[in-house]
Amino acid sequence: MVILETKEWARVTFGECKLGDQRRTKRLIRLAEQAAARPDGSTPDQTESWGDCKAAYRLFDQDDVTFDEIVRPHCEQTRASCRPGDVKLIINDTTEVDFGCSRRATGLGPTGKGSGRGFFLHSALMLDAADAQRKKCG
């Protein structure tokens, strides 16, 4: 398993996005770094300045900046990690981690019917169907 630092992860994950202008790709990488550093925050909380926040909203408002284009490089990296003809199993689970209603901690949000505080954890494990060996996802 390869664990990347936040800046390297953002560059590897989003550096190949084609958003109509290289400056947009650089902005997306910066925004991804900021979001990874504060995943529990809103866009204004995650960005380092009001200018960064406005730039993020301008980026999202561009016609060339689409969900499909943002995830395209990640999907290509995942496909490239598999040889043609290989069968992979991707086992995933979403778990609700609830700390109860009295727990006060940063980064927690409403869970259940809104009375609890916690977060959702979504994990995925890719296995080779032939030998059940764990594989790198993406």
Region roles according to the model:
Residues M1-G138:
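Conserved, well-structured functional cores that handle cations and Mg-NTP chemistry
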